[in-house]
Amino acid sequence: MGNIKCQQLMCDILFKYFVILSVTKFVSSWPKAGSPSRVFDYELHRNVLDPVRCQQQLRDMRTSEFSDASFQVPQGILTSSSVGLGNFHQCLSIKQHVKGKTIEGKFCMISTNIKETKTMSWLTGTSWLLETGVKSIIDGVKQRLRGDKPLVAADYIAIAVFLLIGILTLMSTTYDIWQRFLRKKDPVNSNELLRCFSVYTNTHRLLTFSATSGAIDCIDGIRSISILWIILGHTVIASINKYTMNLFDFFVIFDQRTNMWLISGELAVDTYLVLSGLLLVYTSKSIKKIKQMQLLKNIHVFYLQRLLRMFPLLGCVVLLQASVFHHISDGANWHYMAENVLFCRRYWWTALLPVLNIVNPTQQCLSHLWYLSMDVQLHVISPLVLFWVLGSSRSAWNGLIVGLTTSLTAATVYCFLNDFTSEYDNHVYYHTNTMTRAPPFVIGMIFGYILHINRGRKLRIPFWSVSLGYLAAWATSLYCIDVLYLTWHDELLDKLNRSFMKSLWGVSVCWIIFVCVVGYGGPINWFLSLKLWKFMARISYAMYLFHYSVLYSIFGGIVTPFYFSLESLFLVFASATAYTVICSTAACILVDAPCSTLQKLILKALTSTAKSATAEKPAAASPQKEYIVV
């Protein structure tokens, strides 16, 4: 009986201690009112507390549902579990009438630093707490109330934009179905502008795959595998948080080299940079034999098409992150999502311009969008090389070699002059830096030119050369993955790895593409060219945009501590991928496809105007312009 009474006494003390700390910290940490960037209604948080009746209500809480929904001692403390979340939804749903008073639930989470102590003698009515000798310091408090997500300007803009898209989609789909099935009219003869928002037409176009002459089919598999690898890597990173109840197990699992590939997804970004550079040259050399001066005369179209092609989906995901995604779910860790909502409301323009990897890198609106900013920046400077590639063979090789030498030299000098010891410096000044990521892009341009000059040729490569190339590619790939695992105590080796690792990975990817195109891919080409990859490759850009928000929603909406294991990791990865595919498909049908059609119609109209103007000029006039599509 003595032990039972002792345990009950300790539970009472812990519960009262938690409640008093929650209320006290809440009172002493009011945010400034009137801030336009708040994501929660802190004015509501302030108004619900009546200090005069607080002490009386505290005495009544033990007999209410608060006791059941509140903090419990964490289970598994020896495996690094240090958080007890209580019951988030039960806590917020509490609304009880006790002795003529209405008590509503408020969810509070307090972070404490057990290494420091402080006596809170100023706390009113807590002599019982001081007598126990309990001392602590509060590091931070997170508090939530029911209905504390106010509608802001971003929400109203999102409602207006997506309501307009919905109306246009309904009207366009109705027109399309009426023309196709009621009037039995050939779609070619119907108005393309009126049916550009049609769900029927856009879905049919998205799911129809036809063979195209000169297409590199193996790229579909590479794109799909790369986006899955990126989602998996971000799933692993998202699972490393204070709500993971067995972080010790996490570090044990990833202390093994065999599991290093799970968190090496950053190499997939270099794969995308390789593909971007490769397709830039491969398509530019293939479209109507574009000349050097035509590129310069139409450089504004070159830049504009790149921006317009990526802008609709990018603007869509930024607007959703700043508004709709904040309201689709909720949980004990929703501050994880709210932080990104706040950043997107403040710094949305850095993602759209795009300068996200340069301006304010510590408060990025969806931090994974740095890749898109970098890709556009590389396309902006690419004409410095592309101009020479569009000339003779000699000028093309000279331009490509100079471009590769310049990018490698710049990356190497930059890595040797800087120290990336801290995680912040490594991410901001190395991982998301355009200078260090440029070499794979230029390597892709080189192999794009090689594929172009060998288009339609039947190359004969000795078996030993192909075997040696495969061996070198696989060895290099494994080395690049292993480099991320190893801790380099030699500063020279560390800087050399930083300078050339991404380039080595890019060469390995390009070799696989090359042998697949020229007929030496074998089972690798068969696997990468399977039709099952085509759909995911087609929506891979949208998947890259949406997967981060999906992961934020999953881990932000947790209500119990997350138990990490490889099995649970892959379950979360599978669900995140499924939700991402659904969101991406819907966005491609409702946003990307209509905008793509509108861009083509506008470009077609501009081209027709240019042709008409040229036809009206004398015969000695300059030849007509050819617009570049990349």
Give residue spans per PLM region.
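Solvent-exposed interhelical
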Residues: H379-T405, I450-V466
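Hydrophobic alpha-helical transmembrane segments
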Residues: A158-I159, S373, W397-I401, L504, ...
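Hydrophobic core of alpha-helical transmembrane segments in multi-pass integral membrane proteins
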Residues: A160-T174, A322, L404-C415, Y470-Y485, ...
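Exoplasmic/lumenal regions adjacent to the first transmembrane segment
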Residues: M1-G221, S226, G233-V269, L273, ...
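Interfacial loop-to-helix transition and helix-capping segments at the boundaries
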Residues: D148-F162, V188, G214-D220, Q256-V269, ...
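Structural signal for the C-terminal ends of transmembrane alpha-helices
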Residues: M171-W178, V281-K288, F387-S393, F447-G456, ...
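Kinked, hydrophobic transmembrane alpha-helices enriched for aromatic residues
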Residues: Y17-L21, G214-V252, N259-V281, L308-H327, ...
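Alpha-helical transmembrane segments of multi-pass integral membrane proteins
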Residues: R437, F441-F447, V466-P594, K611-K617, ...
